[in-house]
Structures are given as C-alpha cells and as structure tokens.
C-alpha cells in the first residue's frame, strides 16, 4: 500500500511539474527552462557559425541563433570585436546583409577585410549619441532586410543628456534606463524579422565587493535578461614564434544559453592579422573525434598522411579547403550539430545573394 501511495504521489508530482514547465514555456517562451541532462535543443532555429568550430559545438546548436539578442563581453583586447567580425564574415558568406554600429568609433576596416568581411556590402554607422545608435538599430531591425547587427559597444552608448551636460555632472542610471527602454522596443521586432543583434560589452569592477565576483558589465541589468546567449571571452595566453608574439590563446565561456544547455566553453587561437585559426581547431577536434589520426608527430586523414607537426597540417588544410570542410562537417556530425554547408536553407541563401 505504501509503495502504491508513493508511486501515485510521484506520478502526481511529475504531472504537476509537467504542467508548471508547460506554463513557464507558454509565459516566458520556449527554451526558458529545460532539463540539463536531456540536452534538449531547439532544432528549428537558424544559426550562423561563429568562425570557431569549438565555440559552435559549445553553443550546442552549431552557431549563434538568428532572431535573438546576443551579448559578447570581456576585458580589453580579449577578442570581442574579432569574434563579431568573424560572425559578420560567416553571415555574408550565406548571403546575409550585415550592419556594424560603431559607437566606439574604432573599427579597423583593414583588419575587418583580412578576416573575410566584405566591406562593399557592410553597412557602417558611427552615431553621436546612445539614443541615435539605438534608433538606427531599431530602424534597421524593423526594415526586415538586415540579417545581423553588431553594436560596438554598450559602454560607448552615451545618453544625449550626458554629452550635452557638464563634465562633472552626476546622472545615475541614465544609460541603464536607455538600454532597458531600447531592448523592450527591440526584442519583439528582432524575433519577428529573424535578425540577430549582437551587443559587445565591457567589464567594470564593483567597488567594495569582499566576496564573490567583483566584475560586472556596463549598461545595467536589462541586457543580461534580454540576451538569449551571453559569451564571456578572455585572453588566456600568448602564441609565440621564437620571441615574437603572433597571436592570443582565447577561452570563451557560454555564460547563458536559451537554445541549448549553458556553461560549456571553448578554447581557440586568434592569430594577429588573420583572426580565429579555424584549421588549428579542425585538427585538434578532428583528433578528439577520431576523424583525424595522430601517430607521433604525423597526422593522417582517410589513411593518407597530411603532414608532420600541427603547423604543417594547418598550412596543408589552408591550401586544401575542401578537405578542411569535410573534416569539420564530420566533427559536427559526430557532435550532432548542423553541418557548415547546411547552416541555411539553400533557397534562402540564394535569395540573399
């Protein structure tokens, strides 16, 4: 009898939980709650590669989701702008229209071009005030013809009142209110037009924090709530050739993820002048997935040796792009995420061209 009662009680609890989960999803949207162990993923969303295979895997869906707000934050020179420029390059390859709202007035167009960004088709705005930047963003989203907008950065979205005021004026909470109002307006339109909006953010230190993390991001709390994906990007080391530093070792942590389980991380190399070393990642992840065989210093693929030492294999894959994409798609298949060639429906990619 006790066993039957406990089973009935467990069934009731499970039923009540299912009803609560259904109510939460109805109220707050799909993906607002999920069982971590189920590894449930929204498969009907369109994604765009980040330019990093490891990060695409860590995101759980093969890239950044369209029709969502994304936040990328980290310390100075950690690779925030590089990562977003790589996403722009990937979106342009798929025929998408991209805009860069340069509130910091610091975009290096030569560097963007080296990362594969098509500057001819890129829309660039350098607004004078935070209100102007967010109004431009709103107009672009509402047009329904822009696929990706990057705002660099939240810290540089200075309210008009602050610009027109005196240098020592205290205007607490002005930027936070501006961000909160803008995101309330933007969110529904972003979802409807399937436009991805990436906010780059900076880190500040809270004063007087004795315990816990003293770091916080600028612009108040609104962006934390409205973001579907939040990425914390850090420089963890230098890549050297002899005594010369030629790149950064970078770690990205998925701090928040509404489309797949969060808290995963990826490590990759950002090479100066060329961006994320995709070939280096393909080699490492290919070996992990047993797609590429490693014996001593030699690497082999499909029974054929492709080079001795990682640097030589990296150069080989740069010259043989078809093989690199083939290995990458096998790794993606192994991880159960969308292949790079099939990130968009073909008809949509053609329409955008």
Curated annotation (Swiss-Prot):
Provide the binding site for ATP: 74-81
For this record, the Gene Ontology CC terms, alphabetical, are:
cytosol
> Does Protease appear among the keywords?
no
Q: What does the UniProt keyword field contain? A: ATP-binding, Cytoplasm, DNA damage, DNA recombination, DNA repair, DNA-binding, Nucleotide-binding, SOS response
Predominantly, its location class is cytoplasm
Q: List the disulfide bonds.
A: none
One MF annotation (Gene Ontology) recorded for this entry: ATP binding
Q: Which GO terms describe its biological process?
A: DNA recombination; DNA repair; SOS response
Q: What is this protein called?
A: Protein RecA
Query: Which species does the entry assign this protein to?
Result: Bordetella pertussis (strain Tohama I / ATCC BAA-589 / NCTC 13251)
Q: What is the lineage of its organism?
A: Bacteria, Pseudomonadati, Pseudomonadota, Betaproteobacteria, Burkholderiales
Gene from which this protein is expressed: recA
